[in-house]
């Protein structure tokens, strides 16, 4: 009916989530650091967005990290039982950044 049609036109597009904003910039081939600068956020925040996007299965871990790094992370996480990432960070030191550990953990579902 006319009434419901006109009502539909008034509904605004849902506001994009901060994750979607990050994803759009990523699709424009901006690096994580460029996205952070563009959005006036920290790289840490952008990495957190990607962890969320990986959990939501919108982005693949392999879109962000190189295969050799994923392979190393896979080995590091082999006996991981969901405990604190701090233990892995302690064992592996600077081999992995906190962000890499978080991204990999997000990919575990």
Language-model segments: residues:
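Accessory DNA-binding and partner-docking regions appended to nucleic-acid-acting proteins
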Residues: 1-109
